[in-house]
């Protein structure tokens, strides 16, 4: 019988290195160099000598995990959360809030200079709010522990898919944070623990709602357990099946939030901004920068449920909102009706494709506002230039795509006149920003 040679796999030990951190990027991630290669490392500060383990090694750069701070920086502070070292939710609690903002602002300017080839003006004052108990929305991971035969609830471990079990979270609104422990106890009483996905907690103006992902069909006994939990905690509870259908299990109210004197209804699964006070200030600033008048027609791209559209409609002659999800368009129309606004129209459209042939896109607009998701709005930027609005406000949750998309406007005859950071997510690497462009 023929014998075939099968080489044995070599076991490689993770590379461990020591280097000095030089700077922070816009995520508040440390950057240093080792043997000429850029090393990105979470949890480290400029000036610190650190020991680290290589996680991902590329030709031009590498990502490393912090193992030891040999020489701490003078501005390093103690994290306020006991789970900080493990939890992937926050990544910058070792840095004072003012230093976090400074790093993000410097990163924002650098991205415009490097990626957009644009020299931005002096940054506007940071729009911020409270740095703790600010989140009105959260998604908790759920994992069935086969060894312990129990369900664990928490957030993903830093740089891992593992779960860090938590009993509370200091950046969550307190009514959400205190729900975590009783929620875990409830889920551990269910027969269908292995079929649980994740859970979302949302604080509406009327109370708390919970959306539980369930990949199977919960038994009647499990349904009864969940309903009893919702009644005891005084919350609304919805189930989301594997096919994305959402079923109200215990519903007492129709959720909404207040904004600029308006009431905006939303449903479980809809996107809403997690930081209510900063959202209010963000909308106020966008309206102030756009300066819509009674004769102006405004285009609001990626409009969602009307977060910017409806406040704009009270200033402008007409606003057209465009959104990619039909359910969100319906919600925006409902919100216009409930607030007595009749000068706003809404359309569903794929804003990741060619929009030139769409009826609304052939209309004339005096002003444009964009608030895209992380991939940005590159596909519509050329059309925005063709519309030739006198001002464009771009609200961004990804400064990389903002800098990229800004190039299109600048090449199309616009100049960047205002730029500022929104501190929507303190203690994290997320950076929200707003830019104003004016036609030359």
Swiss-Prot record:
Disulfide partners: none
SUPFAM superfamilies for this protein: Nucleic acid-binding proteins (SSF50249), S-adenosyl-L-methionine-dependent methyltransferases (SSF53335)
Active site residues per record: 397 (nucleophile)
Its EC number(s): 2.1.1.190
Positions annotated to bind [4Fe-4S] cluster: 81, 87, 90, 169
Reactions listed under catalytic activity: uridine(1939) in 23S rRNA + S-adenosyl-L-methionine = 5-methyluridine(1939) in 23S rRNA + S-adenosyl-L-homocysteine + H(+)
Residue ranges occupied by any TRAM domain in the UniProt entry: 10-68
Key words, A-Z: 4Fe-4S, Iron, Iron-sulfur, Metal-binding, Methyltransferase, rRNA processing, S-adenosyl-L-methionine, Transferase
Binding sites annotated in the UniProt record for S-adenosyl-L-methionine: 273, 302, 307, 323, 350, 371
Enzyme class of the recorded protein, top EC level: transferase
One GO biological process term: rRNA base methylation
InterPro entries tied to this protein: 23S_rRNA_MeTrfase_RlmD, MeTrfase_TrmA_AS, MeTrfase_TrmA_CS, NA-bd_OB-fold, SAM-dependent_MTases_sf, TRAM_dom, U5_MeTrfase_fam
Signal peptide: none
CDD domains in the record: AdoMet_MTases (cd02440)
A single GO molecular function term of this UniProt record: 4 iron, 4 sulfur cluster binding
Function: Catalyzes the formation of 5-methyl-uridine at position 1939 (m5U1939) in 23S rRNA.
Record family assignment: Belongs to the class I-like SAM-binding methyltransferase superfamily. RNA M5U methyltransferase family. RlmD subfamily.
Protein name: 23S rRNA (uracil(1939)-C(5))-methyltransferase RlmD
Organism, as annotated: Aeromonas hydrophila subsp. hydrophila (strain ATCC 7966 / DSM 30187 / BCRC 13018 / CCUG 14551 / JCM 1027 / KCTC 2358 / NCIMB 9240 / NCTC 8049)
Gene: rlmD
């Amino acid at each position: 019988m023929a014998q075939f040679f099968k080489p044995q796999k070599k076991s490689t030990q993770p590379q461990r290195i020591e280097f000095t951190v030089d700077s922070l990027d816009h995520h508040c991630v440390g950057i240093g160099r080792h043997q000429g290669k850029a090393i990105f490392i979470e949890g480290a500060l400029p000036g610190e000598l650190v020991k680290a383990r290589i996680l991902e090694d590329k030709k031009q750069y590498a990502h490393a995990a912090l193992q030891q701070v040999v020489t701490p920086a003078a501005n390093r502070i103690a994290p306020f959360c006991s789970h900080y070292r493990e939890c992937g939710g926050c990544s910058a609690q070792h840095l004072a809030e003012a230093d976090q903002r400074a790093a993000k602002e410097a990163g924002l300017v650098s991205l415009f200079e490097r990626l957009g080839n644009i020299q931005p003006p002096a940054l506007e004052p940071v729009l911020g709010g409270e740095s703790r108990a600010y989140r009105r929305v959260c998604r908790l991971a759920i994992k069935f522990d086969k060894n312990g035969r129990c369900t664990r609830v928490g957030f993903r471990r830093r740089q891992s898919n593992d779960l860090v079990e938590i009993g509370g979270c200091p950046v969550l609104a307190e009514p959400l944070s205190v729900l975590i422990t009783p929620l875990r106890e409830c889920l551990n009483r269910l027969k269908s623990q292995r079929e649980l996905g994740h859970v979302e907690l949302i604080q509406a103006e009327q109370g708390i709602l919970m959306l539980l992902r369930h990949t199977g069909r919960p038994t009647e006994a499990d349904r009864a357990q969940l309903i009893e939990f919702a009644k005891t905690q005084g919350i609304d509870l919805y189930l989301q099946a594997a096919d994305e259908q959402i079923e109200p299990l215990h519903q007492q109210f129709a959720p909404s939030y207040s904004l600029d004197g308006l009431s905006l209804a939303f449903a479980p699964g809809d996107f809403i901004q997690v930081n209510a006070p900063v959202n209010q200030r963000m909308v106020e600033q966008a309206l102030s920068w756009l300066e819509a008048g009674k004769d102006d027609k405004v285009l609001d791209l990626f409009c969602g449920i009307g977060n910017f559209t409806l406040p704009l409609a009270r200033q402008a002659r007409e606003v057209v909102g465009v959104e990619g999800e039909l359910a969100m368009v319906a919600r925006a129309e409902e919100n216009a009706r409930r607030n007595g606004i009749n000068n706003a129209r809404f359309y569903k459209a794929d804003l990741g494709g060619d929009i030139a042939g769409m009826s609304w896109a052939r209309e004339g607009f005096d002003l444009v506002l964009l608030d895209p998701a992380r991939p940005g709005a590159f596909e519509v930027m050329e059309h925005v230039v063709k519309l030739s609005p006198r001002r464009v406000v771009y609200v961004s949750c990804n400064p990389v795509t903002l800098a990229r998309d800004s190039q299109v406007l600048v090449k199309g005859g616009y100049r960047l006149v205002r730029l500022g950071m929104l501190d929507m997510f303190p203690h994290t690497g997320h950076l929200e920003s707003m830019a104003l462009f004016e036609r030359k």
